[in-house]
């Protein structure tokens, strides 16, 4: 296991939201386990699973004795990877407002304590973990999206949208998972040239044939400029994946060529995955 994150902090500061962000980034997330059980669980996961990123949510519901033993737990976890502690905090008045708005009780609530007293007690209980924190985030004025971008910055993670470029053949059906579909069946078809039929859109003879057509170049330019303009907007909308499908008749020549050319034009800016759906049908 390469990286272990312990996510903790004051109740109401956004631990659940932070774990959701980390899950979206590919972390295997576990929440609300007692501190004393963490070394055993992590050792088991490290032995039985090929996990590279693990995030553990810890809160004040662990016992006082567990909290005092945090240094020992931390050292045991270090045997399995690099350990960072993300500590979330929020100003008292904002926490009170959040609990009032949600109408949920504080984990330390009782009929003998005010909400403010619960908040102060929790701060003291969490001190052993706070002293170990390597990432400290004040969420007082942060939305969930703000928290996401702060986490990405603090952890050195990329928030790049993953662009999936897919070629397909209309005769095999339109992909159901496509966000956008572009039809390139009007372009010159290498299939009707017997010398080109056996090749795919990845091969140089087909590339030369298609690039000799003004229509091909104009179609590519239009698709490229559309994606180049709008992908940043989609990414700002907090999308993690975008699937763009390019279709020709059989999914071997024209669509494959356009997908390959788009990949080369866009890969400097975006994380790209390529799928040639009809490859098994290529002659």
From Swiss-Prot:
InterPro entries found in the cross-reference section: P-loop_NTPase, RapZ-like, RapZ-like_N, RapZ_C
Recorded coiled-coil stretches: none
Binding site for ATP: 9-16
GO molecular function: ATP binding; GTP binding
Binding site for GTP: 59-62
Transmembrane domains' residue ranges: none
Record keyword Ligase present: no
Keyword vocabulary terms for this entry: ATP-binding, GTP-binding, Nucleotide-binding
SUPFAM superfamilies: P-loop containing nucleoside triphosphate hydrolases
HAMAP family from the UniProt entry: RapZ_like
Role: Displays ATPase and GTPase activities.
Record-stated family: Belongs to the RapZ-like family.
Name of protein: Nucleotide-binding protein ACIAD3059
Origin species: Acinetobacter baylyi (strain ATCC 33305 / BD413 / ADP1)
